[in-house]
Swiss-Prot record:
SMART domains referenced in this protein's UniProt entry, alphabetically: PCRF
Protein name: Peptide chain release factor 1
UniProt modification remark: Methylated by PrmC. Methylation increases the termination efficiency of RF1.
Gene Ontology CC terms, in alphabetical order: cytoplasm
GO molecular function, one term: translation release factor activity, codon specific
Taxonomy of the source species: Bacteria, Bacillati, Cyanobacteriota, Cyanophyceae, Synechococcales
Post-translational modification N5-methylglutamine, affected residues: Q239
């Protein structure tokens, strides 16, 4: 993004910010809580941008003054040296600020602020793949708890020898999707399974889908499209187990998507969870269809977000986790303990780099 384009967009943001300030002072807005919240949220989003722009304007003014001082100091070597030092300092400040502002103005994914549902499925590898799916679930649970998110199992199909054939986890918190969206894809593990008697290394996989939570207004469900049946739960529930039909089996007839919920103690709670999962799955389906049509959007992403894309290999023998999109290795034990900040941070930085590169190409056209 060239400087003139950057400043034009910052001027627009400043004008919008000033207009929002006026609206907040309007008694009609103050008496409408919903409108007040919307305007206040947008103002809060723009405020750091506007403050940085004011700082950039102040630096520009100081730079002009330092340049004029340099011009007038040709006969005073000491003053000339001081003016040159000041120019270098201001150039560095401006460079850092322009980079920060450019990143702030990059196109945002409107889903970034949402909570998510993680769907983890065992892939190739039989029983070991199910155990691996469980290991991934624990990794995300540890990371979520570390950063203060609320992590809860929504639906699970347990495997006979441990782990899960399929598991859906709700992860609630601030901007969860902005960080976990990079986890979508195939996660491959290379290790000696606990069930392997001859010490041979096996390769197994699990797929992860990251589904932003869908608002009921956003994804409307027609009652005629739903087929709901109940069953006796086989999970935790004390005296409820196998005596009361608390499990809910939900089928969305137009798409064939089926959701089975047993995690909650009551049928009503399981029904609500099943509908929540279904909305997220339908929203993910819409997003995948849109991405398939919008190829250019994928060029500015770290990976496609497709659950069939192999994104990472976890090699136990070498204690190494390789992210194939970045071509970078991370310590295996650290990653599995839920220490994902470095890995996710690298994905975010790469996505920003690609977006800036794309903006630069557009500016040249």
């Amino acid at each position: 993004m060239d400087t003139s384009t950057l400043k034009a967009r910052l001027e627009t943001a400043s004008a919008t910010f000033n207009n929002l300030e006026l609206q907040l002072a309007d008694p009609d807005v103050a008496s409408d809580p919903k409108k007040l919240e919307t305007i206040a949220r947008e103002r809060a989003r723009l405020e750091p941008l506007v403050l940085d722009y004011k700082e950039l304007q102040a630096i520009d003014l100081e730079y002009k003054e330092a340049k004029e001082l340099l011009r007038q100091s040709k006969s005073d070597k000491e003053m000339e040296a001081l003016a040159q030092e000041e120019l270098i300092r201001l150039e560095e400040l401006e460079k850092d600020l322009v980079n920060r502002l450019t990143l702030a103005l990059l196109p945002k994914d409107p889903r970034d602020e949402r909570s998510v549902m993680l769907e983890i499925r065992a892939g190739a590898g039989g029983d070991e793949a199910c155990i691996w799916a469980g290991d991934l679930a624990r990794m995300y649970e540890r990371y979520g708890l570390k950063v203060g998110w609320v992590v809860k199992a929504m639906s699970a199909t347990e495997a006979d020898l441990g782990g899960f054939r399929e598991l859906i986890i709700s992860v609630k918190g601030k901007a969860v999707f902005s960080q976990l969206k990079f986890e979508a894809g195939v996660h491959r593990v290379q290790r000696v399974p606990a069930t392997e008697s001859q010490g041979r290394v096996h390769t197994s996989t699990a797929t992860v889908a990251v589904m932003p939570e869908a608002d009921p207004v956003e994804v409307k469900l027609e009652p005629t499209d739903l087929e709901i049946s109940t069953a006796r739960s086989g999970g935790a529930g004390g005296q409820n187990v196998n005596k009361v039909e608390t499990a809910v089996d939900l089928l969305h007839k137009p798409t064939g998507i089926r959701v089975f919920c047993t995690q909650e103690r009551s049928q009503l709670q399981n029904r609500e969870r099943a509908l929540e999962i279904l909305r997220a799955k339908l929203l993910e389906r819409e997003i995948e269809e849109a991405n398939a049509k919008e190829r250019s959007a994928r060029l500015a992403q770290v990976g496609t977000g497709d659950r069939s894309e192999k994104i990472r290999t976890y090699n136990y023998k070498d204690n190494r986790t390789t992210d194939h999109r970045l071509g970078v290795n991370f310590p295996l034990e650290t990653v599995l303990e839920g220490e994902l900040d470095d890995l996710i941070g690298a994905c975010i930085a790469e996505e920003q780099r690609l977006k800036m590169e794309k903006l630069g190409n557009q500016s040249e056209e």
